[in-house]
């Protein structure tokens, strides 16, 4: 059986202005690729909008003979539009030519296919409540309850005795790895190993585990003080991080309903960069975000605040922008706003932003109340760093996230942009995602 090859196919500008049932390619190209088999996987690429459509499983024998009677050098291949022509952001790096074909490898094919799946399919939502409590005999009892609201109602409930000492041992090893490595390439197998232990401890019920891994979903976590520190992003099954198919949202059941934001310019973004001698790549990060906005012709206005802040300066920015991107140092008890001020939490916001992206270390620490306070104040989505992040090491995640979020011709939410960015970078970083998704998806 011949291997099915995968391709990106270009058409011309006029093709995408109408609903066409055929792809046009030169006969000479068809003759070359048909040697490898009659079936190919293909995406359609629109250069003007930097969008990719598909995927199509194309039978090269299924030609539109009525059109192929023309005496020109083109063949017309019938297609079925699998995904209703909703495309994802994509930049073709090779020289663009109309009616051409570019071969891609299997890894690229599945990455692009997964991205289109995400954009075009409804995402399952699961609310997951988890706690560790003492029974009358003083034993630790682990409890969880899961309620899935889409695509159908599904409820799972479980409780059992919990070996807290074993968990502490696994968590201690997680912290050791987290603090000693900025890139997970060397330690990915160790993270998967301890993630597999945690999965067996936390989700022991096989039927529910299989259900959880069936399709892409967002799992909204509601955790008590004993389970908040569980590193959900490293949970692993079958030698893979389950975060490859699941976004764990650290919501603690706050801010599930949208906020009524008043007097807010929804096309404004602020970048807060706190000056520090040890942060040398902030200018590069700022330039990348600005270049994304220019390249995509987005109407977003971006203001830069490259200075130290006090509490009131910081709150003023939060209340006047729809997106706030923060570049600073993170500590176990908060983020640095100035040399003598660490921000641990905020109080109420009159006009909260839709999205706050905190590019700082250690945002997962239990003593750091900033994430939870932002969500409680009405911020829809907070994306935050986990563990030790070397300066500038994950800039490609940030670039991919905003490229997808700001794409003028594709309306996607923050969860979809987060996951598409993960698909982009996971082949370069073997480890788990080093940015957490907190809150609920938001359109900006």
Question: Where in the sequence are the language-model features?
Answer:
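Flexible, low-complexity linker/boundary loops enriched in proline and small hydrophobic residues
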Residues: 118-124, 192-197, 234, 332, ...
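Short acidic/histidine-rich active-site segments
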Residues: 380-393
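Cysteine protease catalytic core and zymogen-processing segment of caspase-like enzymes
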Residues: 309-312, 319, 330-380, 397, ...
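Contiguous surface segments at macromolecular interaction interfaces
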Residues: 2-6, 14-27, 53, 61-120
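Caspase-like cysteine protease fold
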Residues: 243, 250, 255, 337-351, ...
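A domain-level signal for caspase-like cysteine endopeptidase catalytic cores
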Residues: 166-186, 190, 196, 201-204, ...
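Non-catalytic, solvent-exposed interaction/assembly segments
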Residues: 117-220, 224-227
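Short coil-to-beta transition motif at edge beta-strands of beta-rich domains
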Residues: 34-46
